[in-house]
Amino acid sequence: MLTGKHSHANGFTDNTTCVFDGSQQTLPKLLQTAGYQTAIVGKWHLESMPTGFDYWEILPGQGDYYNPDFIMMNNDTVREKGYLTNIITDKSIDWLEKGRDKEQPFCLFIHHKAIHRDWLPELKYLTLYEDKEFSMPDNFYDDYEGRPAAAAQTMSIAKDMDIIYDTKMYREGMKSRLKKAYGLSLIHI
């Protein structure tokens, strides 16, 4: 979304060894040219400092859920006390209310970490369901049964394909469903 290019074309092909090249054209730069104020608060994870933003406060790397550090526009790192989702939301609202020219159009990128693993709740909710067990609902998984296997066979790629899965991500009995749906070798990690 930032450049409108696929990763192989924008040069950022992985999150561990690459550094985003901020000199290329980006959506925030185009918005600035069109008269918009631009800001980003939260997860950046591009190993470079944001360009094309009038204001930014970003997390170093993945960031931490609790008492996270933020890299500020002056390159100082500031530790904030609290839960990351609340902090990002508060910082975003603060910029909307006090940090921008209300007479100008704006685009604010609010990048929450909570949609990324490990999913950790606010501390007050950490033990809320500690002693409870929940069954997986019958409709938890999609019902595209048969479609992946048919597509793989039609494309003649089934013979060269392995499905790699992590048991922490699948409930009991999923191995047999995966094997039945794909008819392929399964590699358990």
Regions found by a protein language model. Name each.
Residues 1-187:
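Formylglycine-dependent sulfatase
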